Amino acid sequence: LNFVPKFTYTIFMGGFFGAASQTDCVFDLFFGIDYHSHLGTRRAGMAVYSPETGFDKAIHNIENAPFRTKFTTESQSMHGTLGIGCISDYEAQPILVRSHHGTFAITTIGKINNANEIVEDIIGRGTHFFEMQNGEVNPTELVAAIIDQKENFIDGIRYAQEVVNGSLSMLVLTPRGIYAARDKLGRTPVVLGQKEDGYCASFESFAYLNLGYHDLRELGPGEVVVFDADHVQTLVAPGKKMKICTFLWVYYGYPSSSYEGISVESMRYNCGRALARRDNVHPDIVAGVPDSGIAHAIGYAN
């Protein structure tokens, strides 16, 4: 009866995508999530909201088959004007929650270093958790529980960013729109795209370009916005302290991505050049391991 699940997490990367459209958003959502497949190989999910039918959700294991194959059926059967989804290297998400805020879906990216303390505090207030895996609470459900400690989504999201020791970016899907919040120190990116009939929020800046969107802007550290098909509203202004994860450029990021206006491919090329200057050798051949190693190798060779 006194069992409290313990977290022993290492860092798990992932990516998310959210879309709001005046028409059906599922096509954009499906391919927007698929463009994040390089960020995870274990689980993926998508959740949509339709004014006519309400919420719908699907989660699949993608260890033995890619996202596009596993979610082909859902891409044809699910419908909605608002949707979020993710590629996750750890927990099953997005999850659906019903609380005093109403029904909402949430997906997160990050690492909660003080999860044990937060779980103990919330359980001590009489709350329980449903999503368990290997004896551990689903981190995304934990974030939802933190948000539910406050009276509204804005205060709840700010509270989650405040109490989490680590990194936390999220998308929250509600009937009124999608909340997008970037980590308080900007460790992981969140970028907004726009097209004629809607908006999107994405981890990767290139994920929506083939879907007809153009760059709107990147969220700043700790910034929170809410958007629907017609507008984007800033709820929490960005902070000034930026500590974006440099490993995005070195390894995680797709070659055509850019973060804070800096191209991943250019950064890797320049890193390769810097390594060559440091080593002061004249090799006969330089080989790069795809994908992240190619630009490093070209920079090193040149």
What does each model-identified segment do?
Residues 2, 6-9:
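Short, positively charged and aromatic/hydrophobic N-terminal segments
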